[in-house]
Curated annotation (Swiss-Prot):
The gene is atpC. Its main location: membrane. GO terms for cellular component: plasma membrane; proton-transporting ATP synthase complex. Produces ATP from ADP in the presence of a proton gradient across the membrane. Belongs to the ATPase epsilon chain family. This is ATP synthase epsilon chain. It is a peripheral membrane protein. InterPro entries: ATP_F1_dsu/esu_C_sf, ATP_synth_F1_dsu/esu, ATP_synth_F1_dsu/esu_N, ATP_synth_F1_esu_C, ATPsynth_dsu/esu_N. HAMAP family: ATP_synth_epsil_bac (MF_00530). It is found in: Cell membrane. Transmembrane segments: none annotated.
Length: 133
């Protein structure tokens, strides 16, 4: 099957750069599957896993928002943060989850609940993706 280059980039630099047959992402508008020759598109991403298929193998990358830019010959994900499944520190992710849950349970006025909810979603996503290795 035909392949195309995919780059997943964060403000800290590239996280993933390979040729793949298909990319699946969760955009704000819904799930997107991208094959070679896809029409040009730009879409905001949810906190989720990016699935990258090549042959019988699938790579998973946890992304925390950002955008996907699709061109007929290349796909670029510009993510706020991103980690490949095999690089996720599950101990750190569990600690972040615990802290976010604690902040959400505190009924104090100074707690930013939206920020705590996003931290919880990011931690859960990282843990889910780490199990997809």
């Amino acid at each position: 099957m035909k392949t195309f280059p995919v780059s997943i980039v964060t403000p800290d630099g590239p996280v993933y750069e390979k040729e793949v047959e298909m990319v699946s992402v969760k955009a704000e508008s819904g799930e997107m599957g991208i094959l070679p020759g896809h029409i040009p598109t730009v879409a905001p991403l949810k906190i989720s896993a990016v699935r990258l298929k090549n042959g019988g193998h699938t790579d998973y990358v946890a992304v925390s928002g950002g955008f996907i830019e699709v061109r007929p010959d290349k796909v670029t994900v510009l993510a706020t943060s991103a980690e490949e499944a095999n690089h996720i520190d599950t101990h750190r992710a569990n600690e972040a989850k615990r802290r976010a849950e604690q902040r959400l349970q505190d009924k104090q006025a100074h707690v930013d609940f939206k920020r705590a909810e996003l931290a919880l979603k990011r931690a859960i996503n990282r843990l889910d993706v780490s199990n997809m290795k």
